[in-house]
Amino acid sequence: MSRRNQAVGAYGERCALQHLITAGMRPVERNWRCPHGEIDIIAWDGPVLAICEVKTRRTDTFGAPAAAVTGPKARRLRVLAAQWLAETGTRADEVRFDVLSVRVTAAGPPRIEHLKGAF
């Protein structure tokens, strides 16, 4: 991944994090990593633990941002969530998997779509 794409992705994650906070969610972890992958954001939405995948795009050339979360990616996030829960000892009655699509434009603020329970 190019440095420019990394910068766009990092910017999108910061925007998504602020969006979640503004919506009243409580982030507990950001960019959690293990040998099997990474979870972008983990946050409480009331009693529900949300595992959030952030996808940022500058154009729709390669499709909508959320379309990048394919079956294999969803399965990997489920495994990562189980590992995070086990490692931290966190208990949650409900775990939800969300996708935040961030579209960055040259003019104006980014557009953020929060798909709760995306998979």
Curated annotation (Swiss-Prot):
Instruction: State the NCBIfam families in the record.
Output: PRK12497.1-3, PRK12497.3-3
Organism of origin: Salinispora arenicola (strain CNS-205)
* Record-stated family: Belongs to the UPF0102 family.
Entry's InterPro entries?
Answer: Restrct_endonuc-II-like (IPR011335), tRNA_endonuc-like_dom_sf (IPR011856), UPF0102_YraN-like (IPR003509)
- Please name the SUPFAM superfamilies in this protein's record: Restriction endonuclease-like (SSF52980)
Q: What is this protein called?
A: UPF0102 protein Sare_1228
Q: Which GO terms describe its molecular function?
A: nucleic acid binding
